[in-house]
Amino acid sequence: MKKIAILTSGGDAPGMNAAIRAVVRTAIDKGLEVMGVQRGYSGLLNGELFAMNRTSVSDIIQRGGTILRTARCPEFKDEEVRKRAVKILNAYGVDALVVIGGDGSFMGAKLLSKLGIKTIGLPGTIDNDLAYTDFTIGFDTALNTIVDAINKIRDTSTSHERVSIIEVMGRDCGDLALHAGISSGAEAIIVPEMGEFDRDALCRTILDGKNHGKTHSIVILAEGIGGAEELSKYVQELTGIEARATILGHIQRGGAPSASDRVLASRLGARAVEVLLQGETSRVIGIRDNQIVDQDIDEALAIESKFDLDLYNVAEVLSR
């Protein structure tokens, strides 16, 4: 193996730059050439590749987003399109590809592997929705961004004695909502893993809190449930307490990565190169029990949700 390429795909996550830096510098240290691919699989199809060196990744570990840019590429599901991508990689002399992203990005990597390109995936998504790894790159930073926002919302919620319903990211995974809820002392946490929730029970919880002296309530809602605006109107109507909805949106994706995300991304990126040099392909890198691990992509994606029911139950007790 002489040359590898690296791309970021799907939604951006803080810490992606730290991972890029780790891959590039580890690869160069091992005597490999490195190429960056701009704008994910879409950029790959357009031949947007460029040579990278140590200087290319100087002063980026503290930056949010991704210097390689990112994009979604639904056409990559077409095998003929993927064959075109392989021809482009071959034309540049690329032997292996490191992909930073989520499950969709990993599927693209797996399919490229079947066409002869060695691939390794790094988990870059704020949702923490890849069950094979304890944490994904970007989760910790997004969590801290959310908690900071909740703290500010709580200030105004307290002043106005109102209910604040805060919607956070997490389409199929409630980890952000759960961890943010317990970190901020929320009165209720609503996540997709717990099934359909009872709006009337939520209203009773809020009224019970008021009867015990609570002057305001914070409710954290995962976007996979959605409907924050509608829920706030329902709560206000049934409880008689003013309620407001806040959808945090893309602020959760931005900002300088936390120290934890920088360390995680650096460890994962370095291991990705080591696994490639061992001749492995179609693998993903993750962390379990603070140990860096690698696993077959299919096996990793087949693992069911790792939602922490024990932590949810702790949050339920502490919110009363």
From Swiss-Prot:
Ranges in a coiled coil: none
Cofactor(s) the protein requires to work: Mg(2+)
Keyword Cytoplasm: yes
Pfam families, A to Z: PFK
One annotated Gene Ontology cellular component of this protein: 6-phosphofructokinase complex
Gene Ontology MF: a single term: monosaccharide binding
Residues that hold Mg(2+) according to the record: D103
Pathway(s) served: Carbohydrate degradation; glycolysis; D-glyceraldehyde 3-phosphate and glycerone phosphate from D-glucose: step 3/4
Entry's Gene Ontology BP terms: canonical glycolysis; fructose 1,6-bisphosphate metabolic process; fructose 6-phosphate metabolic process
Record field: catalytic activity: beta-D-fructose 6-phosphate + ATP = beta-D-fructose 1,6-bisphosphate + ADP + H(+)
Keywords assigned: Allosteric enzyme, ATP-binding, Cytoplasm, Glycolysis, Kinase, Magnesium, Metal-binding, Nucleotide-binding, Transferase
Residues that bind ADP: R21, A22, V23, V24, R25, R154, G185, A186, E187, K214, T215, H216
Residues that hold substrate according to the record: T125, I126, D127, R162, M169, G170, R171, E223, R244, H250, I251, Q252, R253
Binding of ATP, residues: G11, R72, C73, G102, D103, G104, S105
Gene3D superfamilies attached to this UniProt entry: 3.40.50.450, Phosphofructokinase domain (3.40.50.460)
KW Transferase (keyword) present: yes
EC number: 2.7.1.11
Reported regulation of activity: Allosterically activated by ADP and other diphosphonucleosides, and allosterically inhibited by phosphoenolpyruvate.
NCBIfam families per the UniProt record, alphabetical: PFKA_ATP, PRK03202.1
Family statement: Belongs to the phosphofructokinase type A (PFKA) family. ATP-dependent PFK group I subfamily. Prokaryotic clade 'B1' sub-subfamily.
Quaternary structure annotation from Swiss-Prot or TrEMBL: Homotetramer.
Reported function: Catalyzes the phosphorylation of D-fructose 6-phosphate to fructose 1,6-bisphosphate by ATP, the first committing step of glycolysis.
Protein name per Swiss-Prot or TrEMBL: ATP-dependent 6-phosphofructokinase
Annotated organism of origin: Clostridium botulinum (strain Eklund 17B / Type B)
Gene designation: pfkA
